Amino acid sequence: NKSKKRRNRVSFLGVATIEPPKPIPLTWKTEKLVWVNQWPLPKQKLEALHLLANEQLEKGHIEPSFSPWNSPVFVIQKKSGKWRMLTDLRAVNAVIQPMGPLQPGLPSPAMIPKDWPLIIIDLKDCFFTIPLAEQDCEKFAFTIPAINNKEPATRFQWKVLPQGMLNSPTICQTFVGRALQPVRKKFSDCYIIHYIDDILCAAETKDKLIDCYTFLQAEVASAGLAIASDKIQTSTPFHYLGMQIENRKIKPQKIEIRKDTLKTLNDFQKLLGDINWIQPTLGIPTYAMSNLFSILRGDSDLNSKRILTPEATKEIKLVEEKIQSAQINRIDPLAPLQLLIFATAHSPTGIIIQNTDLVEWSFLPHSTVKTFTLYLDQIATLIGQTRLRIIKLCGNDPDKIVVPLTKEQVRQAFINSGAWQIGLANFVGIIDNHYPKTKIFQFLKLTTWILPKITRREPLENALTVFTDGSSNGKAAYTGPKERVIKTPYQSAQRAELVAVITVLQDFDQPINIISDSAYVVQATRVVETALIKYSMDDQLNQLFNLLQQTVRKRNFPFYITHIRAHTNLPGPLTKANEQADLLVSSALIKAQELHALTHVNAAGLKNKFDVTWKQAKDIVQHCTQCQVLHLPTQEAGVNPRGLCPNALWQMDVTHVPSFGRLSYVHVTVDTYSHFIWATCQTGESTSHVKKHLLSCFAVMGVPEKIKTDNGPGYCSKAFQKFLSQWKISHTTGIPYNSQGQAIVERTNRTLKTQLVKQKEGGDSKECTTPQMQLNLALYTLNFLNIYRNQTTTSAEQHLTGKKNSPHEGKLIWWKDNKNKTWEIGKVITWGRGFACVSPGENQLPVWIPTRHLKFYNEPIRDAKKSTSAETETPQSSTVDSQDEQNGDVRRTDEVAIHQEGRAADLGTTKEADAVSYKISREHKGDTNPREYAACSLDDCINGGKSPYACRSSCS
């Protein structure tokens, strides 16, 4: 074909003519036309634009156009007075698919072998010598307007790579790279660097360099590219990519930083970007530019104002001095590279050397991702980063890495530091700690805080133990050999805790063990000694962390710090001591509650000691189960324990109401004291749904002391336990797969469903259309209207007032102890359906008893001493037990007796109740039955109410 013939055509000189590379087509995100109107231009600029357009037209770079695309065009005047034409291609670039960078970074001139001769060339108008694909030309059309629209506008489109097009640099690199491929292949022993349109050639001898350059000229010309003859460099000093290259040394080109133009964030961002570009050559440590970096903080608007501080001005001056004096060295290609790590302030500094010649500096970024980064981890990160840089520069790992650690410290780092293991992964070279003897590194400001000296990983023996705590009310405290409370301005418990730890480190100039209930503070204190602290926009937090670090580093004695979980109710001295520290920082109300829990002081005493109101003091007493009754009851067989006051014990469960649709999961909570019910309908029964339900309960019922649930996953999750811990609520579960432990809430579920059915089938509440509205109406009825058996008030009244209404409360009874098989005397604390809570006497825990194991004492209530002493008169129940086994009617008679007693008592006539009780007692067989020992209580007893044995013939 024709193209093949052209490729094989031979000129009269005998040199093959190579066809220029084909244009690279662009990929477009959309076929939608892009038209941006041309803005008016002043007459002077319009005339300059016409001249430039005609010039480009003559050179064949543009052509007339009728394209439906348009981009604005404008001109700018250079310092020389010449005009330059530019096209605003932002709208077009937005619909071009990016090609991606081919050279992500500048090549380092330090890799050019030393003493090799060089030639540096610059391609002339490189973009304008590379054609656009024919189908893409119309996308880069522009319009030159006419003044007053007195004539049609002139339209052109680019035929070559336009300045400002998104992919122009990539296409240019590709074209030039293709042109240089034959040169690289033929002169593989030469060192050739190509970046955009700048080309550097180095060879071991001058003759070989000339041969290489001659061949390069021909290849570049055959590709349609032109060399700028006025920019060819053949002698030292060479200038390439901002560097001045000599036979062995490389220096940055002399520049002066204009400080008068530094006014906005964008100005400082550009300045630091330029400094960062030459930092590997300048060798300015990161810590030496901290004030310049701090100017970047704040408003992220590029046009936001910034002020050059005196400290930052000094750092700019340092940069200028380094530009004048800094230098690096070209390498010997036959000698290996080494990496030196110096423990400089703020963060470590890396130096790539060859023998004693400096090749490049390496630094970590000024800002870090973590709040605290250990210095050892920084060293490991810098090693990994610089190893990759060396491999990128020369293709090999460094021959040796020198670190500021002993052999034992290096061994421990491999064992304990994950960052160290990653940074040195697959390294087979030498790890040493002997630095070369040279003066070029002596200016570095070194630090000794590489590994911890004061902070210990294990508890200290024979050291003081101090507990710390902080509260959101701003108080910090510690307790131990002595106690101290510190008032802080912080409204964060963690920050107050941080102040407490700092104070302990300052107050105890001796070895100490610190125990804190803040995991965050503990972790920060453990690592702060050698850590780089990340800057935070919160100035208070910065000050606290810096003060903590300074305090730790100033200490002369070691310390150990560990974490303890708060409010766990675990036994042991650590928990008690931590609670004592908590008490020191609690608010007045919390202190009053904790003091009452400790001493059970009355409301007047609480108000006198703490700054609380009468209502708050009374609420504390009313919510205390010990102060409302004698003691907290213990669980006995066959009984569901109830709360003895509102919010003492809740039961909670999830039931299902299919008619509610996706809200069919109804979460139900019942207060076991008042039987107050609250329920919410939700879409599931996970922990998040349970927490949402409980927050609703808290808003209506208050916060309970204890909650009992089944063993569902929503109730047994760690997230739920954490939620309860935050609210200081204890939690118990029933026996798996046994619903009897949840009998109260199970019965409540049935009651609630029944009420819902009643409302739906026979109610007139047509307004209750949503599931929650139906549920709320049922709850209002059950809580505020219904009065249940053995109650005289509604559940809502009982829950809000805490008032007991059982008619049997305070009465003396006989109760059966199933463990000892004996009948004992007790006093009724509360009485419900099928259960009662009984106090056996002073200093004894109350017990929950089924009503079938209760029998009325039937005598005027005596004082506690006499009631307790009566136990000596109580007969053993072995005969009763044997009768229970032999005669099934006895148990039935007991139950009938209790039922009749309750019924008689409900009538309100004590005489009749006593008479019924005595009559039933005579039906029991044997003299050892407790009924036979019940004293006669008839007003006309001829024996004075003594033993009923003497009354059988007279009083009965």
From Swiss-Prot:
Instruction: Give the family, as the similarity comment puts it.
Output: Belongs to the beta type-B retroviral polymerase family. HERV class-II K(HML-2) pol subfamily.
Which annotated residues bind Mg(2+) 1? D469, E497, D517
EC assignment: the record states: 2.7.7.49, 3.1.26.4
Extra facts: This protein is synthesized as Gag-Pro and Gag-Pro-Pol polyprotein precursors. These polyproteins are thought, by similarity with type-B retroviruses, to be generated by -1 frameshifts occurring at the Gag-Pro and Pro-Pol genes boundaries. Exact N-terminus of this protein has not been formally described.
Role: Early post-infection, the reverse transcriptase converts the viral RNA genome into double-stranded viral DNA. The RNase H domain of the reverse transcriptase performs two functions. It degrades the RNA template and specifically removes the RNA primer from the RNA/DNA hybrid. Following nuclear import, the integrase catalyzes the insertion of the linear, double-stranded viral DNA into the host cell chromosome. Endogenous Pol proteins may have kept, lost or modified their original function during evolution.
Q: What is this protein called?
A: Endogenous retrovirus group K member 8 Pol protein
Q: In the UniProt record, does the keyword Ligase occur?
A: no
Region span, Disordered: 864-890
Instruction: Provide the residue positions that the database annotates as binding Mg(2+) 2.
Output: D469, D582
Q: Which domain of life is it from?
A: Eukaryota
In chain numbering, motif LPQG lies across 161-164
Keywords associated with the record: DNA integration, DNA recombination, DNA-binding, Endonuclease, ERV, Hydrolase, Metal-binding, Multifunctional enzyme, Nuclease, Nucleotidyltransferase, RNA-directed DNA polymerase, Transferase, Transposable element, Zinc, Zinc-finger
- Pfam families, sorted: IN_DBD_C, Integrase_Zn, RNase_H, rve, RVT_1, RVT_thumb
Q: Please indicate the residue ranges that the annotation assigns to the motif YXDD.
A: 195-198
Q: Residue ranges of the RNase H type-1 domain?
A: 460-590
- GO terms, molecular function: DNA binding; RNA stem-loop binding; RNA-directed DNA polymerase activity; RNA-DNA hybrid ribonuclease activity; zinc ion binding
Binding of Zn(2+) occurs at: H596, H600, C624, C627
Domain named Reverse transcriptase is located at 57-245
Q: Which SUPFAM superfamilies match?
A: DNA-binding domain of retroviral integrase, DNA/RNA polymerases, N-terminal Zn binding domain of HIV integrase, Ribonuclease H-like
Notes concerning its domains: The LPQG and YXDD motifs are catalytically important and conserved among many retroviruses.
